[in-house]
């Protein structure tokens, strides 16, 4: 063969001896023919391989085995589909879902499995799991169509949607906003917004300087800043945008919009509130007072002060934007610049003034063609008005409806007859007919409120919604209980009074959702995520009669009991939370000592507490004998008895002397008191009973004895019973007449054992 005839590189190389030595050394590990040169012993990354080819052959076997075990895992499940997949087809849906779950698990634990220089996520050690807001049910939800039916039930929170649902926007009148008249959830383009108006119960403050904002600007995420402060903050970043210091959303300078924050009154329980009757046409998203209602084809203009608070969008011309938006910001910036001219913030105030001037110039240049078109239209309108002037005069002369009803009105009145002579005979008849119609028509309708809307304007009620809203324009609406009372009194909401003033009984806050829309149809004009309140007021006789209130007394009282129960539960919950927080801080409740316990704390006073008939039957149990001597106890007892019983003399009340005790001998009186009878102890230890709920507003009541006191008293009574000597039976007499000796008990012995 040609290879055998040629010499090997090892033979030709002068250093072949060294190579042979290396081959001989490696012969113990494996055959010499399998060894590779140095160039072949390096892998693709340049690192040397530590093992030879024979050692490397074992790895593919393990990989195939591991692959087989991994592939065989799905086959063990009962739901595994054994049908082979089609050629060129996609994966099965079940396997794809399983792979997605495995991928998420692998992504969750990958940071903990593989160590490296980067930070390691150790959330799995804390058993920390969370679900996305969009899919709370997970893939194993019971109903697969839940998300499609309730598209807003699990919708994630959107800051821009919340901002546009709870604010009022001043927009330019150049654009078309007809879409916002049909869908309340349609977002207004942020580029069309000239000013944002926020109605809040608190005064807004800049989170950077902590002062009321000057020439305030609002971001798309809904946070308000001073214009110089936010310019200073944006200048610190090297990029064109920066993170919001509150919520870390992106802030761009061109997205900053002018904002005006208006403080509104926060209604609470006990306040007086005035509710106004509102009217809204079905299909229209603007509700107005019934007395000021008008047909709308476009959003309300900024100059309409009567309806400006009831619309979400306000149309403004370029002149109104210059006068009401730019001029006010310019005045505030100049005032701040004069006050802080020597401070480092002056440069940012100058930058804000320059941007404000650029905005005014761009607005004027954009409005020039519109001004020219408006002047041309005004000229054409004036020319048409001058041409049609005689025609309009003729039309005004022709349209006289007074002569069409009665021919007698055209005739001149007679001067001889006075106008008061003919009406008197007709007035009583007219009044009687009017009274009959009123009494025949109104009274049955008040007794039957359902029939009243049917008789009067059935079509009008089907095209309009009537409801009560706060007079200042806040989203505060009347409770259904009050609405039913008014409907029963007046027949329908359309005939209810224009305004009602009453005291607030309860305020419930809500957020608009699809479910709330289906429940309250009259609030369909509110966008999703809009916050509103339902207010229950105390209606009185001026607005509702006493007879109507009696019909709804049961329902009103039921709601009152529910409120009281809710308040009690809230109070108990606050107490539990307070105790838990104090326990975390090492503060524990103080020990409760029952001072009404006469066994532990006997009362000695001059006023009689008990009438003692005999000393033997009624005895006070004094303090524990460990803390006082028997003589002191006897003296105190005698003193107490003397104060309680007037038959005691002064000599008997004194303590016996030592000589008297010696003379008395065995007949000495008992110095240790006896235990009091059970009924006396029970009478002295009866505490005041608490109410059923364990709660009482009266703070001066006697508290309920704790378990510690009752248990200690029971133990003390048991020990006192054991201490009292039981009556000994009569001693048995023997036949011989001798008494039986009492068996003596050996206490201790003094005998000594002697050892040898």
From Swiss-Prot:
Pfam families: zf-C3HC4
Cellular component aspect of the GO annotation: cytoplasm; nucleus
Keyword match Cell cycle: no
CDD domains referenced in this protein's UniProt entry, alphabetically: RING-HC_RNF10
Region Disordered: start-end pairs: 1-100, 682-702, 725-756
Zinc finger (RING-type): 206-248
Gene Ontology biological process: negative regulation of Schwann cell proliferation; positive regulation of myelination; positive regulation of transcription by RNA polymerase II; protein monoubiquitination; ribosome-associated ubiquitin-dependent protein catabolic process
Keyword Transferase in annotation: yes
Catalytic reactions of this protein: S-ubiquitinyl-[E2 ubiquitin-conjugating enzyme]-L-cysteine + [acceptor protein]-L-lysine = [E2 ubiquitin-conjugating enzyme]-L-cysteine + N(6)-ubiquitinyl-[acceptor protein]-L-lysine
GO molecular function: transcription cis-regulatory region binding; ubiquitin protein ligase activity; zinc ion binding
UniProt family annotation: Belongs to the RNF10 family.
Protein name, entry field: E3 ubiquitin-protein ligase RNF10
Species for this entry: Xenopus laevis (African clawed frog)
């Amino acid at each position: 063969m040609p290879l055998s005839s040629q010499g090997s590189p090892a033979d030709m190389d002068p250093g072949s001896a060294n190579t042979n030595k290396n081959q001989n050394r490696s012969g113990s590990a494996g055959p010499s023919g399998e060894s590779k040169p140095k160039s072949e012993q390096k892998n693709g990354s340049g690192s040397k391989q530590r093992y030879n080819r024979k050692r490397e052959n074992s790895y593919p076997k393990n990989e195939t085995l591991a692959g087989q075990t991994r592939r065989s895992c799905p086959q063990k499940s009962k739901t595994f589909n054994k049908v082979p997949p089609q050629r060129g087809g996609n994966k099965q849906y079940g396997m794809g879902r399983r792979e997605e779950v495995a991928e998420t698990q692998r992504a969750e634990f990958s940071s903990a499995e593989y160590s490296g220089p980067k930070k390691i996520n150790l959330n799995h050690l804390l058993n920390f799991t969370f679900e996305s807001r969009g899919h709370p049910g997970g893939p194993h939800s019971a109903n697969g169509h839940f998300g499609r039916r309730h598209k807003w039930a699990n919708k994630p929170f959107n800051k821009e949607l919340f901002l546009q649902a709870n604010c009022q926007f001043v927009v330019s009148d150049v654009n078309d906003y007809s879409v916002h008249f049909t869908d309340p959830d349609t977002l207004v383009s942020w580029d069309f917004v000239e000013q944002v108006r926020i109605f809040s119960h608190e005064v807004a403050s800049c989170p950077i300087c902590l002062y009321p904002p000057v020439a305030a600007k609002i971001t798309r995420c809904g946070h308000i800043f001073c214009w110089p402060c936010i310019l200073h903050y944006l200048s610190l970043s090297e990029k064109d945008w920066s993170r919001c210091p509150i919520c870390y959303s992106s802030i761009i300078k061109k997205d900053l919009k002018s904002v005006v924050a208006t403080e509104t009154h926060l209604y609470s329980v006990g306040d007086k509130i005035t509710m106004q009757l509102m009217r809204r046409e079905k299909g229209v998203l603007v509700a107005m007072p019934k007395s000021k209602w008008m047909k709308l084809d476009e959003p309300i203009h900024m100059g309409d002060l009567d309806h400006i608070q009831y619309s979400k969008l306000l149309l403004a011309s370029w002149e109104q934007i210059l006068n009401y938006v730019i001029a006010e910001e310019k005045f505030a910036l100049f005032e701040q610049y004069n006050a802080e001219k020597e401070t480092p913030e002056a440069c940012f105030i100058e930058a804000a003034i320059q941007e404000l001037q650029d905005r005014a110039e761009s607005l004027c240049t954009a409005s020039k063609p519109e001004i020219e078109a408006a002047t041309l239209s005004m000229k054409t309108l004036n020319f048409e008005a001058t041409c049609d002037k005689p025609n309009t005069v003729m039309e005004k002369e022709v349209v006289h409806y007074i002569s069409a009803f009665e021919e007698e009105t055209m005739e001149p009145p007679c001067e001889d007859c006075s106008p008061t002579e003919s009406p008197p005979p007709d007035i009583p008849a007219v009044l009687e007919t009017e009274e009959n119609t009123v009494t025949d028509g109104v009274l049955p309708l008040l007794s039957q409120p359902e029939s009243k809307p049917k008789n009067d304007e059935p079509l009008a009620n089907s095209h309009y919604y009537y409801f009560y809203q706060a007079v200042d324009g806040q989203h505060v609406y009347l409770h259904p209980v009050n609405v039913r009372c008014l409907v029963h009194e007046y027949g329908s909401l359309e005939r209810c009074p224009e305004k009602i003033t009453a005291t607030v009984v309860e305020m419930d806050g809500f957020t608009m959702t699809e479910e709330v829309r289906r429940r309250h149809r009259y609030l369909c004009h509110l966008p999703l995520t809009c916050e509103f309140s339902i207010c229950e007021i105390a209606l009185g006789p001026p607005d509702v009669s006493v007879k109507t209130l009696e019909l709804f007394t049961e329902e009103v009282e039921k709601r009152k009991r529910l409120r009281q129960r809710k308040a009690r539960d809230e109070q108990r919950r606050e107490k539990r939370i307070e105790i838990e927080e104090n326990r975390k801080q090492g503060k524990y409740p103080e020990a409760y000592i029952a001072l009404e316990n006469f066994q532990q704390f006997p009362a000695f006073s001059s006023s009689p507490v008990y009438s003692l008939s005999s000393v033997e039957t009624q005895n006070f149990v004094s303090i524990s004998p460990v803390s006082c001597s028997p003589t002191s106890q006897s003296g105190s007892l005698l003193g107490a008895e003397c104060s309680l019983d007037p038959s005691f003399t002064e000599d008997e009340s004194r303590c016996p002397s030592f000589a008297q005790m010696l003379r008395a001998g065995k007949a000495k009186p008992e110095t240790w008191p006896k235990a009091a009878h059970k009924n006396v102890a029970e009478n002295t230890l009866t505490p005041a009973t608490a109410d059923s709920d364990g709660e009482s507003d009266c703070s001066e009541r006697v508290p309920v004895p704790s378990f510690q006191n009752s248990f200690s008293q029971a133990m003390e009574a048991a020990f006192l019973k054991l201490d009292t000597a039981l009556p000994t039976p009569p001693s048995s007499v023997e036949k011989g007449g001798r008494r039986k000796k009492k068996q003596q008990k050996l206490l201790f012995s003094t005998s000594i054992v002697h050892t040898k």
